[in-house]
From Swiss-Prot:
Similarity section: Belongs to the universal ribosomal protein uL24 family.
Record's keyword annotation contains Nucleotide-binding: no
Entry-linked InterPro entries: KOW, Rib_uL2_dom2, Ribosomal_uL24, Ribosomal_uL24_CS, Ribosomal_uL24_KOW, Translation_prot_SH3-like_sf
UniProt organism field: Chloroflexus aurantiacus (strain ATCC 29364 / DSM 637 / Y-400-fl)
Protein name stated in the entry: Large ribosomal subunit protein uL24
GO biological process terms held by the UniProt record: translation
A Pfam family of this chain: ribosomal_L24
Gene3D superfamilies cross-referenced by the UniProt entry: 2.30.30.30
Phylogenetic lineage: Bacteria, Bacillati, Chloroflexota, Chloroflexia, Chloroflexales
Length: 110
Protein backbone atom coordinates (compact mmCIF):
# COMPACT_ATOMS: atom_id res chain seq x y z
CA UNK A 1 0.00 0.00 0.00
CA UNK A 2 1.14 3.54 -0.70
CA UNK A 3 0.04 4.86 2.72
CA UNK A 4 0.79 3.81 6.30
CA UNK A 5 -0.70 4.38 9.74
CA UNK A 6 -0.01 7.94 10.90
CA UNK A 7 0.28 9.45 7.39
CA UNK A 8 -1.56 12.70 6.60
CA UNK A 9 -3.82 12.14 3.58
CA UNK A 10 -6.26 14.01 1.32
CA UNK A 11 -9.51 12.31 0.28
CA UNK A 12 -9.77 12.53 -3.53
CA UNK A 13 -13.10 10.73 -4.11
CA UNK A 14 -16.40 10.13 -2.33
CA UNK A 15 -18.63 12.13 -0.02
CA UNK A 16 -15.67 13.58 1.92
CA UNK A 17 -13.69 14.65 -1.17
CA UNK A 18 -11.23 17.47 -0.40
CA UNK A 19 -10.97 16.80 3.34
CA UNK A 20 -7.72 15.99 5.13
CA UNK A 21 -7.10 13.52 7.92
CA UNK A 22 -4.62 11.21 9.57
CA UNK A 23 -4.70 7.46 9.00
CA UNK A 24 -5.75 5.63 12.18
CA UNK A 25 -5.59 2.10 10.79
CA UNK A 26 -4.45 0.46 7.55
CA UNK A 27 -6.08 -2.77 6.36
CA UNK A 28 -3.70 -4.07 3.66
CA UNK A 29 -5.52 -7.41 3.23
CA UNK A 30 -8.56 -5.59 1.79
CA UNK A 31 -6.65 -2.45 0.56
CA UNK A 32 -8.59 -0.08 2.83
CA UNK A 33 -7.72 2.60 5.38
CA UNK A 34 -9.55 4.20 8.32
CA UNK A 35 -9.03 7.98 8.34
CA UNK A 36 -9.61 10.11 11.45
CA UNK A 37 -12.86 12.11 11.15
CA UNK A 38 -13.62 10.94 7.59
CA UNK A 39 -16.42 8.65 6.30
CA UNK A 40 -18.49 8.83 9.50
CA UNK A 41 -21.35 6.31 9.59
CA UNK A 42 -24.08 5.69 12.17
CA UNK A 43 -24.22 2.22 13.66
CA UNK A 44 -27.30 0.86 15.44
CA UNK A 45 -25.87 -1.17 18.32
CA UNK A 46 -27.65 -3.57 20.65
CA UNK A 47 -26.79 -3.43 24.37
CA UNK A 48 -23.77 -5.65 25.10
CA UNK A 49 -24.05 -6.04 28.86
CA UNK A 50 -24.21 -3.73 31.86
CA UNK A 51 -21.22 -1.55 30.90
CA UNK A 52 -21.99 -1.17 27.19
CA UNK A 53 -25.41 0.35 26.48
CA UNK A 54 -27.01 0.20 23.05
CA UNK A 55 -28.04 3.04 20.79
CA UNK A 56 -26.88 4.82 17.68
CA UNK A 57 -23.13 5.34 17.65
CA UNK A 58 -21.03 7.20 15.10
CA UNK A 59 -17.82 5.61 13.85
CA UNK A 60 -15.31 5.92 11.02
CA UNK A 61 -15.79 3.37 8.24
CA UNK A 62 -12.88 2.20 6.06
CA UNK A 63 -12.19 3.89 2.71
CA UNK A 64 -10.54 2.24 -0.27
CA UNK A 65 -6.85 3.15 -0.37
CA UNK A 66 -7.15 4.44 -3.95
CA UNK A 67 -9.50 7.20 -2.72
CA UNK A 68 -6.81 8.87 -0.60
CA UNK A 69 -3.61 10.66 -1.61
CA UNK A 70 -0.61 11.13 0.64
CA UNK A 71 0.28 14.69 1.68
CA UNK A 72 4.06 15.06 1.45
CA UNK A 73 5.53 16.17 4.80
CA UNK A 74 8.30 18.21 3.12
CA UNK A 75 6.41 20.10 0.36
CA UNK A 76 2.91 19.97 1.90
CA UNK A 77 1.18 19.01 -1.36
CA UNK A 78 -0.93 15.95 -2.10
CA UNK A 79 1.21 13.94 -4.48
CA UNK A 80 1.79 10.52 -5.92
CA UNK A 81 4.43 8.37 -4.29
CA UNK A 82 6.99 5.93 -5.55
CA UNK A 83 9.40 3.47 -3.99
CA UNK A 84 13.15 3.37 -4.33
CA UNK A 85 16.10 1.60 -2.75
CA UNK A 86 18.67 3.50 -0.69
CA UNK A 87 22.39 2.75 -0.52
CA UNK A 88 22.15 1.98 3.21
CA UNK A 89 21.02 -1.47 4.26
CA UNK A 90 18.48 -2.76 6.76
CA UNK A 91 19.24 -5.14 9.63
CA UNK A 92 19.36 -8.14 7.24
CA UNK A 93 21.88 -6.55 4.89
CA UNK A 94 19.40 -5.77 2.08
CA UNK A 95 19.06 -2.31 0.49
CA UNK A 96 16.44 -0.25 2.35
CA UNK A 97 13.19 0.40 0.43
CA UNK A 98 11.61 3.81 1.08
CA UNK A 99 8.70 5.87 -0.26
CA UNK A 100 9.38 9.17 -1.98
CA UNK A 101 7.28 12.10 -3.19
CA UNK A 102 7.11 12.29 -6.99
CA UNK A 103 6.43 16.06 -6.86
CA UNK A 104 9.48 17.19 -4.85
CA UNK A 105 11.58 13.97 -4.93
CA UNK A 106 11.95 13.96 -1.11
CA UNK A 107 12.13 10.72 0.89
CA UNK A 108 8.98 10.27 3.02
CA UNK A 109 10.08 7.36 5.22
CA UNK A 110 12.81 8.17 7.71
Amino acid sequence: MHVKTGDEVLVIAGKDKGRRGKIKRALPAVNRVVVEGINIVKRHQKPRGPGRPGGIIEMEAPLHASNVMLICPSCGRASRTGKRFLEETDHKGRPRKVRYCKACDAVIDK
